[in-house]
Amino acid sequence: LDRRGYGMSSVRFICGTQDVHRELERKLSGFLGTEDTLLFPSCMDANAGVFEALFSEADVLIADRLVHASIVDGMRLSKAAQDTFKHSDMEHLEEKLAGHLDKRFRVVVTDGVFSMDGDLARLDEIVTLAEKYDAMVFVDDSHATGFMGATGRGSHEHHGVMGRVDILTGTLGKALGGASGGYISSSATVIEWLRQK
């Protein structure tokens, strides 16, 4: 209380960034194996902000049909074209990727662990297909971070594709201490772009 008072009276974009924000972002980046991280009030807010800020009419978002509702809502805010593939159907995903080669960015959008059924994304196969078609991979790992992988880093660790997933979102409200908050974790370039948007 002596150092920080009772807390910020609003979000950091209004009241400013404190050293504890950056410290947590650095620790999350180190844990997740990414270059940088940006904190949000919740993962729902992270998912709401990521697509609109990064993608335009020149791009396409290709989502697993069972992604979390917050991802669907976030995609709707973006001007990017939107498409879906049958749940965990890699042949259908490949058809979709091949059909959108005219787009600037092709982004495969998935959960790491699907919250309704508890099944895992076939992330190793998704990443391989994305690399074949020069596409990006977005994973909401809210239900995997802290649980999946040898050291709890999430579905990208579990499937052996750490460093090959372009954008991770997640929550601090589950395995990571039960606090509130969410994050986007990615390359330094992507996170700096998001900070400026």
Where are these regions (language model features)?
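Active-site C-terminal subdomain of aminotransferase-like
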Residues: 133-136, 143, 148-197
